[in-house]
Design a protein with these regions (language model features):
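Short, well-ordered coil/turn residues at beta-beta hairpins
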Residues: 13-14, 187, 192, 204
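A short catalytic or substrate-binding loop motif that flags glycine-/basic-rich loops and adjacent residues
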Residues: 120, 165-170, 178-179, 193-194
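Active-site beta-strand termini and strand-to-loop segments that position acidic
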Residues: 174-180, 202-204
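Active-site rim elements
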Residues: 110-116, 161-163, 188-189, 258-267, ...
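Beta-strand-loop-alpha-helix segment that lines the small-molecule cofactor/substrate pocket
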Residues: 8-9, 15-16, 20-68, 82
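C-terminal helical cap and adjacent loop that interface with cofactors, partners, or active-site loops
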Residues: 127, 195-204, 210-213, 219-280
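A structured beta-alpha segment of the ubiquitous adenosine-cofactor-binding alpha/beta core
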Residues: 1-8
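Predominantly a Rossmann-like dinucleotide-binding segment in NAD(P)-dependent oxidoreductases
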Residues: 56-61, 66-166
Length: 280
């Protein structure tokens, strides 16, 4: 592929373990790369991607579509315009049983590795809220996981053979504190039955926003008035109509035809289309 004339960009959508060698090879051949999440699995490999991109002067983008979700983009704009006041805490997660989407390589990786093995859908959007690596950075974390109550059972179902042990717990929770004293709660669970959730939540001194299980927002009367919303009781959440008003007001300024096309091509509201548009 890299030897073909006219190829400027290579998408890497393979198993996690092969992301880095493929991406590095493509950049060394003078091709920019877009790498599926997670782009790399170790700090050594992360630095290898960074070093290669800088040495070859090629773009290397991790394809994290969750940061292009309509709700996440609108809340990010609200936060940066101060509508929630000072942000103090954020949450994100990746939780739903992946069922028939299990592949042998992914199951084997989970058998061998503990911790949050798929964190970017959750941590990507909330890092943007806190301006991580812009005005703040992560300082330290505490993480724990449950036992693998379903791991061996799922391994048997996917792999067709038994295993004596399974390293990845059913639920992983990670608490991160930033240098500026903000906190992040990141969760991962693809084993137990539950509705899909990325647990997106922003907690500020003047407001609150959360996407799951249903969109919720709460604003002070002063902040709500800035966008023409009347709040009679600041102890009550906004109604659905008021939330929609906010989402429209703070929506990214894509042309209407782009938004229509994104929704037609992407059943999840267009977030993958908007992500790909960055590479056009």
């Amino acid at each position: 592929l890299c030897q073909q004339q006219g190829v400027n960009l290579v998408y890497v959508c393979t198993d996690w373990m092969s992301h880095v060698p493929i991406a590095i090879h493509a950049m060394e051949q003078g091709r920019s790369v877009a790498v599926e999440v997670p782009a790399a699995l170790t700090l050594k490999d992360i630095w290898a991607l960074i070093d290669t991109a800088e040495q070859t002067r090629q773009h290397c983008m991790m394809l994290e579509n969750a940061v292009y979700d309509r709700f996440e983009m609108a809340v990010c704009q609200m936060v940066h315009e101060g509508l929630l006041g000072e942000l103090v805490h954020v949450e994100g997660g990746y939780a739903h049983p992946i069922g028939d989407r299990w592949t042998p390589w992914r199951m084997e990786y989970s058998r061998l590795n503990a911790g949050d093995v798929y964190p970017t859908h959750s941590i990507g959007p909330v890092c943007r809220l806190l301006d991580i690596h812009r005005t703040d950075r992560m300082h330290y974390l505490t993480a724990m996981q449950t036992n693998a109550f379903l791991g061996t059972e799922m391994y048997q179902a996917v792999m067709g053979k038994a295993c004596d042990s399974f390293a990845n717990g059913d639920q992983t929770s990670t608490m991160i504190r930033t240098v500026k004293g903000k906190t992040m709660l990141i969760q991962h669970n693809v084993m137990t039955p539950r509705p899909y959730s990325r647990m997106f939540q922003a907690v500020g001194t003047a407001g609150y926003a959360a996407k799951y299980p249903v969109p919720e927002m709460q604003l002070s009367p002063e902040m709500a008035a800035k966008v023409g919303i009347e709040v009679e009781d600041d102890k009550l959440p906004l109604n659905a109509s008021q939330i929609e008003t906010l989402l429209n007001y703070y929506a990214p300024s894509f042309p209407s035809e782009t938004i229509t096309l994104a929704k037609e091509l992407d059943a999840r509201g267009g977030m993958s289309y908007f992500m790909d548009l960055r590479l056009a």
